[in-house]
Regions:
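Conserved beta-strand segments of alpha/beta enzyme cores
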Residues: 26, 48, 91, 116, ...
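Rossmann-fold dinucleotide-binding core
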Residues: 4, 98-177
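NAD(P)+-binding Rossmann beta1-loop-alpha1 motif at the extreme N-terminus of oxidoreductases
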Residues: 1-58
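Short, basic/aromatic-enriched C-terminal tail that caps enzymatic domains
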Residues: 268-294
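Helical "substrate-binding/catalytic lid" subdomain
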Residues: 168-271
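Rossmann-like NAD(P)-binding element
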Residues: 47-86, 90-93, 98
Length: 294
C-alpha cells in the first residue's frame, strides 16, 4: 500500500486516483483552494482530503501532478517549496501535457531540492483508467512508477534524457489535437456548400477509424478546448526548441483558439453533427475573423 497525493482531482486526476484506490493504495488531496464541487467529487471517490498541501505531501510517498499545462511549473515550484529540507521527499510525477523543455525545467526544480522527478504521459480515455490506456514514464524513478501502474494499464519506459515521455506525448498530440482542428475546417467548407451530412456519411463509410476518433473526441472540445489550446502552445514551444517551423501545429492551434473564443456551451452534451452545425452557423472559422487570433 502506497500513500499518494493527487494534484489535483479533475477529470483525469479523479480517474487515476480511483484506479489506484482499487489497487489498495491510499489517495490524499489538499483542496483548500478548490471548489465545493471538486471537494464533493474527491470525497465521493474515497480520497482523503487534507487541510493543507504540506499535510498531504507529508503522508505520501508519491505525488501525482495532473493539472492544466499552464499550471504545471507552478505546481512543481509549490511542491519543491514544501519538500525542501525533508529527509525523504515523495517522488514527484508530472503527468501533464507539457513540452520537453517544460518537463526539463520541472525536473531541475525538483532536483534542486534533492527530490526525484518522473516525466509521465497518459494516453487514452481521460474519464477512466484501464486496459485502453497506455502510460509512458521517463526518469531515474521510472521503474518505480511503472510498477505502481503495471496492474492497471500498459506501461512503457522512454529511455534517454529527462523529458522523453513528454516528447512522445507532444508528438502524438500533434495528430490527436490537430486532426479535430482540420476536421472542423473540412466540415465548415462542406456545410457552406450544403453537403455536410453527405460528407460526414462518406467519411464514416470510407475512413471509419478516423471517424470513430473524431466522434469520440471532438464533442468534448467545447468543455476542454482551453486546455487543448494550452497543449498546442506547449507543442509549439517544443517544435521551436527543435528548430522546426511548426506551421501545421500553429494553424491547428489558431482553429482551436477560434473554437474557444466562440464560447459554445461547455455544459451541453454535444453530439458530433450538432457541434459541427453550431461551428458552421457561428462562423467560427470564417475568413472575416482572420487576424482576430494571434
Amino acid at each position: 500500500m502506497t500513500g499518494i497525493v493527487l494534484i489535483s482531482p479533475g477529470l483525469m486526476g479523479t480517474a487515476v486516483g480511483r484506479a489506484l484506490l482499487c489497487r489498495g493504495h491510499v489517495v490524499y488531496c489538499a483542496l483548500s483552494r478548490r471548489s465545493d464541487a471538486t471537494r464533493r467529487r474527491a470525497e465521493q471517490s474515497g480520497f482523503i482530503c487534507c487541510d493543507s498541501f504540506g499535510e498531504a505531501i507529508g503522508k505520501s510517498e508519491i505525488a501525482l501532478s495532473l493539472v492544466p499545462p499552464g499550471q504545471a511549473l507552478n505546481v512543481a515550484r509549490r511542491f519543491a517549496d514544501h519538500v525542501a529540507g525533508l529527509p525523504a521527499a515523495p517522488i514527484f510525477v508530472d503527468c501533464n501535457s507539457i513540452s520537453p523543455p517544460t518537463a526539463r525545467a520541472i525536473g531541475r526544480i525538483i532536483a534542486d531540492v534533492g527530490a526525484a522527478a518522473v516525466d509521465c504521459g497518459i494516453f487514452g480515455p481521460a474519464d477512466k483508467i484501464g486496459p485502453e490506456n497506455v502510460i509512458v514514464v521517463n526518469g531515474s524513478e521510472a521503474r518505480a512508477i511503472a510498477s505502481l501502474f503495471a496492474d492497471l494499464v500498459e506501461v512503457k519506459i522512454a529511455h534517454g534524457a529527462f523529458g522523453g515521455a513528454s516528447a512522445v506525448k507532444m508528438a502524438m498530440s500533434i495528430i490527436t489535437k490537430a486532426l479535430p482542428a482540420l476536421f472542423l475546417e473540412s466540415t465548415c467548407a462542406s456545410a457552406a456548400s450544403g453537403q455536410l451530412d453527405l460528407m460526414v456519411g462518406l467519411f464514416d463509410r470510407l475512413y471509419p477509424g478516423i471517424m470513430s476518433f473524431i466522434s469520440r473526441s471532438l464533442p468534448t472540445y467545447p468543455r476542454h478546448v482551453a486546455r487543448r489550446v494550452d497543449e498546442m502552445h506547449e507543442i509549439e514551444i517544443w517544435l521551436r526548441d527543435l528548430g522546426l517551423s511548426g506551421a501545421m501545429t500553429h494553424s491547428a492551434r489558431q482553429n482551436l483558439d477560434r473554437l474557444r473564443d466562440a464560447e459554445l456551451s461547455a455544459e451541453r452534451k454535444w453530439d458530433l453533427i450538432a457541434l459541427l452545425d453550431a461551428v458552421a452557423r457561428h462562423g467560427v472559422l470564417a475568413a472575416e475573423r482572420e487576424g482576430a487570433v494571434a
